[in-house]
From Swiss-Prot:
Name of this protein: RecQ-like DNA helicase BLM
This enzyme's EC code(s): 5.6.2.4
Spans annotated as Necessary for dimerization and homooligomerization: 110-162
Function description: ATP-dependent DNA helicase that unwinds single- and double-stranded DNA in a 3'-5' direction. Participates in DNA replication and repair. Involved in 5'-end resection of DNA during double-strand break (DSB) repair. Negatively regulates sister chromatid exchange (SCE). Stimulates DNA 4-way junction branch migration and DNA Holliday junction dissolution. Binds DNA. Binds single-stranded DNA (ssDNA), forked duplex DNA and DNA Holliday junction.
Short sequence motif named Nuclear localization signal, residue ranges: 1104-1120
Catalytic activity: Couples ATP hydrolysis with the unwinding of duplex DNA by translocating in the 3'-5' direction; ATP + H2O = ADP + phosphate + H(+)
Domain remark text: The N-terminal region mediates dimerization and homooligomerization. Both the helicase ATP-binding domain and the helicase C-terminal domain form intramolecular interactions with the HRDC domain in a ATP-dependent manner. The HRDC domain is required for single-stranded DNA (ssDNA) and DNA Holliday junction binding.
Region of interest (Disordered), ranges: 1-109, 164-215, 260-323, 381-408, 1068-1183
Domain HRDC, residue spans: 983-1063
Natural source organism: Gallus gallus
One example of a Gene Ontology biological process annotation: double-strand break repair via homologous recombination
Main subcellular localisation: nucleus
Biased composition (Low complexity): 1143-1158
Enzyme class: isomerase
């Protein structure tokens, strides 16, 4: 793009040199910079993303009369480099030195150059608009690629036609409102460096963001700058970081601007100029041996403390310029807090010293920074801010690790913090209603953006906290928030959870009674409705005139707060779960244009994300994304034996999760019933769930599984689970191949929502591909293009399963556009390592191009093209499936033909040959043509693929990873962890708390995990404390919940409170089991100073008289650990071996003998009777 600008300058440069030279004597010193910055008109779309500094008064506009300032740079007669001269110190040098012939010919090129300039500028403007609309992470799938390439070709053609023109001129923007004219005495000629950046989409802009002074990147004299080739810039740890080479640096010379200084930590605060630190120029004159040369100060990094190291060649005097490295600085790094209120004020200049030759810079190259990137780079670099010695707190954003590259986008800096009018009320509700104490990634920014009336698109993985992003704003905002959700079960679960938080919410679905619906409509029609969240289905919105009338009534009274589209991937036809009623939701934007909209999803690749925003007609939405990585999930793919898959599931469950809840996904209803029956027969509580059951039966099965009442495993089709927020699902097993990566990610993501380690297991067989292809072809809805999309999604899933080399986690994230994930994540977290990373690298890469060519020729000779099964065939052609081809290639006796490639693959194992042929299908070298037999069976026959000819022509090489052995169910040794006694008590306490919540759930008719989540219960158990003040510090525990359920919870915690309270422990006597602590040499005999052991309280001769039980084969440590002879203290206190208290031998033997037979049970004190807190009183009575 920037080369186009260079040619543009060249067209008019010669014709204007003379005129500029004549005018130079009339120019004021401050006017030079102004003329430079007044050449390019900016479109409104060029700076919609910019956050304005909100100045007190509008900046004055500048005259666009002078278009070019070529006299700023002066050709050096000695070395040919450009020299920068001050206009006050050397006014006689302002006239350019040109040869006479060049001056005479400049007028002849003026008209032609001006015409060419207009053409090139128009082309450049179009390209800029296109590039500005493309985020970097979408460049691989941009929708305007064709148009962009056409514009680039047109530009090259224009540049070729203008080869005879001189390009030694500089263009400046026309209408740039900047601070350069505030001080007419400011010395011009100081370079402003504008480095390249990335294209930034208009996502995230606001209608008011159009007042920031902007700078369009300028192209400078190509003869005045040297080239820095292949300069690799460090990647910034930001959401859309990238690596770029062959970058360019552009130096301009507006009036004096303050220079940010780099602190010792590598971060920079934009400093407001002062008398001591500001010298009227960005260039400082060094002392010593280099006193004759100017140097540019160290480049500032962004105020967000992003790390970008300097990579310019050593010794280059210009290497300190911040543009050399800060090529990724763009809107995402813009921080409004970096601007000072008085940034427009004039700066007192100093005497301009004699100007030395200008430093050398790299020329422009194709693919350079877009307009908006350079605009923000120049604006951020030129705007004064706080002094570097006193940086503003809260402005820095630490760089994230590569494992989460899509979080903390600096473009959302203006939504961070608690500086808004709603912040106080929001925090109050956040703490008191939701019982939370800290926000997760992007939650605070998304909530603030919603409360500021922005459209928001939120992409967070399951468990990332999407619901809070609209529930908390709904509680803060006036009016009703309408939430559109796809499933009734999901709606009921969300409303139920909100009611436990005392948040007014309700729902309107097709199955509620007319009386209940009338009550809801009556409430909505009130002057001040108490309902904060109204949940509806998309079908209800599209079909119910009564609901639309109620919404219009709220809209007219300005009580319609926002629309929330949950599971927004259903909107896109490119998504894995497209629904027509979702696509019709754009009617909400048309009917209620001013109502903000929020779309949320956990599964959407870049293409689907863009389609969702377009379909819903969202207005410049703020996009909040997170890493798709689910850090607590362990991914495995195992080979499937279709007739034994149910037994394989059973064995795996009994081995790894014998008592945990899980889901088994099956392809058909029949498989659900069959799998559930086999599991039940083997003693595992399993039930089937599919559309063939009645509504009442489905609800019953779901309720049993959710509450763990007679159902541990649910065997379901893929439709199950979207509406269930059960947090403690420890495993998800796919007994059949999913239809797409998106579907697999969402279905497997239903495990481990509480953050605990969970398994995602997939049984894979290529035979499932044929079944799924048939289902896709039988779909009534959709055209051939939609079917092809589904086929592509299916083969992406097959490729995931066939890949035995790359990490499973990295494959999933790469599909969603997250390509810079930490490749060592599995190695760094062995508890969730995937099967590919845990497997030894027992494969070797082999070039199999020759073998593949033989296979292609065989298929050409014996098989047909796609769609040729029922058509005319060549003589001798046949129908061969992949399995038949494998037999022929291996040279098996059962092969249908024993010629051609017969036996050529005898050196391979059958497993590798099968993988090779499947790879050829995935790589589109071969293809499969589906044929339906008379018995309604689907058979896939091998035909040539679209890339077969490329292989034959030698244009495509085939690499294959050959493994030594076929994959099988690995025999992994179950790790037996030795738990300390306190850990055992925590586990026992957690079990009792869970049972208590289940009892409370039955009484209050809510799911037990909606009372306290699994993670909250675990934190409560880990405290082993019954102190309400301690419990209130835990996320998810509020005073309202303690008032409802506190008595029962504290009653359980009282049993374990002596583990944390020494005073309580002092009142108890703990006995040990016979033969444990009392045996000689035991390592576990311990007691507190004030606790008397029953062993030491008895007769001293008791040790010699006691006999060991003859059948005792257990270890001493195990007996002791269950005996409870150690006392632990909370708050980090260490347990220690206790000395016997004086007089311990005089303890009552009666008490000792009475307790000895109890088998080392803990002594439990009576529960305390609460008196100080009213909410500790029991709230119910168990009959």
């Amino acid at each position: 793009m920037e080369e186009a600008r260079a040619a543009t300058n060249g067209g008019s440069g010669e014709s204007q040199k003379l005129s500029n030279g004549e005018k130079s004597s009339q120019l004021e010193p401050g006017d030079v910079g102004n003329e430079l910055l007044a050449d390019i008109e900016l479109e409104e779309d060029d700076y919609l993303d910019v956050v304005p500094p909100s100045p007190e008064e509008e900046l004055p506009s500048f005259s666009p009369s002078v278009r070019n300032v070529s006299n700023i740079f002066k050709e050096s007669p000695t070395d040919g480099r450009s020299a920068v001269h001050g206009t006050e110190s050397e006014p006689e040098l302002m006239a350019p030195k040109q040869p006479a012939a060049e001056q005479d010919s400049s007028a002849e090129h003026a008209d032609k150059g001006l015409h060419l300039e207009q053409q090139l500028y128009s082309v450049m403007e179009d390209i800029c608009k296109l590039v500005d609309a493309i985020p970097l992470h979408e460049l691989t799938s941009i929708s305007c690629a064709k148009e962009l390439l056409q514009q680039r070709e047109l530009r090259r053609k224009l540049l070729a036609d203008s080869g005879a023109l001189n390009t030694n001129s500089v263009n400046g923007p026309r209408n740039w409102k900047a601070c350069v004219q505030q001080d007419p005495s400011s010395r011009p000629g100081t370079p402003l460096c504008s480095g390249p950046g990335r294209g930034v989409s208009s996502v995230g802009s606001t209608p008011k963001s159009t007042n920031l002074p902007s700078v369009l990147s300028r192209t400078v004299n190509s003869s005045s700058f040297s080239t820095i080739r292949n300069q690799t810039l460090d990647k910034l740890d930001t959401s859309y970081s990238s690596k770029e080479t062959d970058q360019e640096v552009i130096c301009l010379e507006p009036a004096a601007l303050p220079s940010p200084k780099v602190n010792g930590k590598g971060s920079t605060s934009l400093s407001r100029p002062s008398e001591a630190s500001f010298n009227g120029s960005w260039c400082e004159k060094p002392t010593g041996r280099d006193s004759g040369n100017w140097r540019v100060p160290e480049r500032p990094t962004a105020s967000t403390a992003l790390k970008a190291q300097h990579t310019a060649p050593a010794g280059n005097p210009a290497s300190g310029c911040w543009d050399v490295n800060d090529t990724d600085f763009d809107l995402d790094h813009f921080d409004i807090d970096d601007f000072d209120e008085g940034w427009e004020e004039a700066v007192a200049p100093e005497a301009a010293p004699e100007a030395p030759p200008a430093p050398q810079w790299q020329p422009l190259r194709e693919g350079s920074a877009s307009l908006r990137c350079r605009l923000l780079a120049a604006a951020a670099g030129s705007a004064p801010g706080p002094h570097p010695t006193a940086p503003k707190s809260g402005c820095g954003i630490s760089a994230k690790s590569s494992s989460e590259p899509l979080v903390h986008n600096p473009a959302h800096e203006r939504f961070r913090g608690m500086k808004f009018s709603h912040s106080e009320e929001m925090l109050k509700i956040f703490h008191r209603k939701f019982g939370l104490h800290s926000f997760r990634t992007n939650q605070l920014e998304a909530i603030n953006a919603a409360l500021l009336g922005e459209d928001c698109f939120i992409l967070m993985p399951t468990g990332g906290g999407k619901s809070l992003c609209y529930q908390l704003p709904a509680c803060v905002s006036a009016g009703v928030t309408v939430v559109i959700s796809p499933l009734r079960s999901l709606i009921i679960d969300q409303v139920q959870k909100l009611k436990t938080l005392d948040i007014a919410s309700t729902y309107l679905t097709g199955d509620i009674t007319d009386a209940d619906a009338s009550k809801t409509y009556m409430q909505l029609s009130k002057k001040d409705p108490i309902i904060k969240l109204l949940y509806v289905t998309p079908e209800k919105v599209c079909a119910s005139n009564r609901l639309l009338s109620a919404l219009e009534n709220l809209y007219n009274r300005k009580l319609l707060a926002r629309f929330v589209i949950d599971e927004a991937h259903c909107v896109s036809q490119w998504g894995h779960d497209f629904r027509k009623d979702y696509k019709r939701l754009n009617m909400l934007r048309k009917k209620f244009h001013s109502v903000p909209m929020m779309a949320l999803t956990a599964t959407a690749n870049p293409r689907v994300q863009k389609d969702i925003q377009n379909q819903l007609e969202m207005l410049k939405p703020q996009v909040f994304t997170m890493s798709f990585n689910r850090h607590n999930l362990k991914y495995d793919v195992l080979p499937k034996k279709p007739k034994k898959v149910a037994m394989d599931c059973l064995e795996w469950i009994k081995k790894y999760h014998p008592h945990d809840s899980g889901i088994i996904y099956c392809l058909s209803r029949h498989e659900c019933d069959t799998t559930a029956a086999i599991l039940q027969k083997e003693g595992l509580a399993a039930l089937a769930y599919h559309a063939g059951l009645t509504d009442s039966n489905r609800d019953l099965v779901q309720k049993k599984w959710v509450n763990q009442e007679g159902c541990q495993v649910i065997c379901a089709t893929i439709a199950f689970g979207m509406g269930i927020d059960k947090p403690d699902v420890r495993y998800v097993i796919h007994a059949s191949l999913p239809k797409s990566i998106e579907g697999y990610y969402q279905e497997s993501g239903r495990a481990g929502r509480d953050g605990e380690m969970s398994h995602c297991l997939l049984f894979y067989s290529y035979s499932d591909v044929t079944r799924l292809r048939r289902l896709i072809l039988m779909e009534k809805d959709g055209n051939s293009h939609t079917r092809q999309t589904h086929f592509n999604n299916l083969y992406s899933m097959v490729h995931y399963c066939e890949n035995v080399v790359d990490c499973r986690r990295i494959q999933l994230l790469a599909y969603f556009g997250e390509t810079d994930f930490n490749p060592n994540f599995c190695k760094d977290h062995p508890e969730v390592i995937c099967d590919n990373c845990s497997r030894k690298k027992d494969y070797k890469s082999r070039n199999v191009t020759d073998e593949v060519k033989s296979i292609i020729r065989f298929v050409q000779q014996h098989c047909g093209q796609v769609g040729g099964i029922n058509g005319n065939r060549n003589t001798g052609s046949g129908r061969y499936t992949l399995n038949m081809m494998v037999d022929i290639f291996l040279g098996a006796k059962s092969a249908k033909i024993q010629s051609g490639i017969f036996g050529k693959g005898a050196a391979y194992s059958r497993h590798n040959v099968e993988r090779l042929f499947r790879k050829l299908v995935l790589d589109k070298i071969l293809d499969e043509d589906l044929y339906i037999t008379a018995n309604d069976q689907a058979v896939a026959y091998v035909v040539l693929g679209e890339k077969a000819q490329a292989v034959l022509n030698g244009l495509l090489q085939v690499e294959f990873h050959e493994t030594e052995n076929a994959s099988a169910i690995r025999k992994q040794r179950a790790s037996v962890t030795k738990m300390s006694q306190r850990e055992e008590m925590v586990k026992k306490c957690l079990g009792e708390l869970t049972d208590t919540c289940k009892t409370l759930g039955k009484i209050f008719d809510v799911h037990y995990f909606n009372i306290f989540s699994t993670s909250t219960l675990k934190k409560i158990a880990e405290t082993l404390s019954s102190d309400a003040e301690v419990l209130l510090q835990i996320d998810g525990v509020t005073e309202d919940k303690l008032e409802k359920y506190g008595a029962e919870i504290i009653k359980v915690m009282d049993k374990y409170s002596e583990w944390t309270t020494p005073e309580d422990a002092a009142c108890q006597s703990v006995d040990t089991a016979p033969g444990s602590a009392g045996t000689p040499g035991s390592e576990e005999e311990a007691a507190d100073d004030v606790v008397t052991s029953s062993y030491f309280g008895g007769n001293a001769n008791q040790r010699r008289k006691r006999k060991r039980l003859p059948n005792s084969g257990e270890s001493k440590r195990k007996k002791t650990s269950s005996g409870g002879s150690q006392q632990f203290y909370s708050k980090g206190a260490r347990y220690r071996r206790a000395r016997r208290a004086p007089g311990s031998r005089a303890a009552a033997p009666a008490q000792s003998s009475a307790l000895r037979g109890a088998g080392a049970r803990l002594g439990i004190m009576a529960p305390p009777k609460p008196s100080s807190r009213h909410f500790l009183q029991p709230s119910y009575a168990v009959l």
